Amino acid sequence: MQPRVPSAAGYGVDAEEIARRYEGVAFEVVHEEFLPWLPPGPGRVVDIGAGSGRDAAALAARGYQVVAVEPTPHLRRIGQRLHADAAIDWIDDALPSLTGLRGTFDFVLLSAVWMHLDEPERVDAMRRLAELVVPGGHVALSLRHGPVPAGRRMFAVSAVETVALAERFGLSAVHRGHGSDCLSREDVGWSTLVFRPEPPTIAGVSR
């Protein structure tokens, strides 16, 4: 039996170069489609798979209380160094279980993370995301499509499959988009998805 490859495999080897590329593109450019779904006022936000901290720092600058989850030690240290002045709570944790992450959040961001999980992990992770987001909050997810870089662990996951899985755990898609790669890789494309918890029902009647 082959040993299990961690979902974040490959990111520690070239962490400095990866961070340089991430930091070279602004949060507002990469996540333009997510901007309308950010909380309207101060709230709790978690960036799962925070990488170099670019997104977490941008969210903190908007006044949110931000938790950055990053399992790769090299990237986490780089993020803490680059954004030392930002009000970010960094934690060492990973999907699918996120055992160290406490509380609930108004906005849950997963940027270029979901395709690193295999099918059983995606089921467990979606269940956990549904637990983390508050009623009226949003889960924003970007999904990479394209060839797998050497040394990385990625799976072919469609937006349709992801939406169907989210629905199993009470998360409805309120936004679906598809776009090109911000780093100008011609063979890479992205799906953008935003989910919201479905309202509770009583005797089959929504309220």
Predicted regions and their residues:
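Conserved acidic residues
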Residues: 106
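Short, conserved loop/helix-junction motifs that constitute active-site signature segments
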Residues: 131
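Class I (Rossmann-like) S-adenosyl-L-methionine-dependent methyltransferase catalytic domain
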Residues: 1-46, 51-103, 117-124, 128, ...
